[in-house]
Amino acid sequence: MARITIEDCLKQIPNRFQLTLSATYRARQLLQGHTPKVDAKDKPTVIALREIAAGHVGIEMLKKVPS
């Protein structure tokens, strides 16, 4: 079972709403075939949260969203 806490992610992105959006966009990228930046044994949503907690992905995800 994947153990990732929101508190670990909130250290990187303090706003819960921005954290949710960033994780969502990153998970979508992973589903589209982008390479994970951490161990990829879990589902895309868990991988996205792990990347955020590790500091590999951050708020910049919101700037990459097409308008």
From Swiss-Prot:
Reactions it catalyzes: RNA(n) + a ribonucleoside 5'-triphosphate = RNA(n+1) + diphosphate
Cited InterPro entries: DNA-dir_RNA_pol_omega, Pol_omega/Rpo6/RPB6, RPB6/omega-like_sf
Keywords annotated in UniProt: DNA-directed RNA polymerase, Nucleotidyltransferase, Transcription, Transferase
Biological process according to GO: DNA-templated transcription
Enzyme class: transferase
Domain of life: Bacteria
A Pfam family recorded for this sequence: RNA_pol_Rpb6
GO MF annotation terms: DNA binding; DNA-directed RNA polymerase activity
One GO CC term, this protein: DNA-directed RNA polymerase complex
EC number(s) recorded for this UniProt protein: 2.7.7.6
Functional note: Promotes RNA polymerase assembly. Latches the N- and C-terminal regions of the beta' subunit thereby facilitating its interaction with the beta and alpha subunits.
Family as reported in the entry's similarity comment: Belongs to the RNA polymerase subunit omega family.
Assembly information from the UniProt record: The RNAP catalytic core consists of 2 alpha, 1 beta, 1 beta' and 1 omega subunit. When a sigma factor is associated with the core the holoenzyme is formed, which can initiate transcription.
NCBIfam families according to UniProt: rpoZ
Name of protein: DNA-directed RNA polymerase subunit omega
Gene name linked to the record: rpoZ
